[in-house]
């Protein structure tokens, strides 16, 4: 008798589970197609060096970060038109002017060496962003890929950052106009390959 009751209960539970996993969704409920989530994050950027633009006198005025569905983003905003950058993965990221390696002080399994072809100071040589060389300038707590953003200084019109990431992952760099007369150099680092 016990065996019969156990078999009936097991059969009933399996039947409910089968119906629950194979029944069509309720009206109006979205069902993603197979592979749709993976396709939505189909990143084709690669992890090779990226460089563009030219030297500008527009000062860097803000550094911020954001989380997105498929990537994490660092935004470098300038007061004026700035289009120049060099970004690459590196074993060492030297500070501007002194050459002190930032990697030992930057969290992450891999490090992007970001050089902006614009100063982080104005025409009077006053700093235009908060933070000194070696400071962690953006809070990236709970980000999927970003681990750290460290200011590497600004010297003779060049500004450096060490961006620590979870691992060597694809990235892209985009130059965007605005807001207003400002411009932005945007670094996106994918969550996965």
Region locations from a protein language model:
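Secretory targeting and sorting signals
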Residues: 1-30
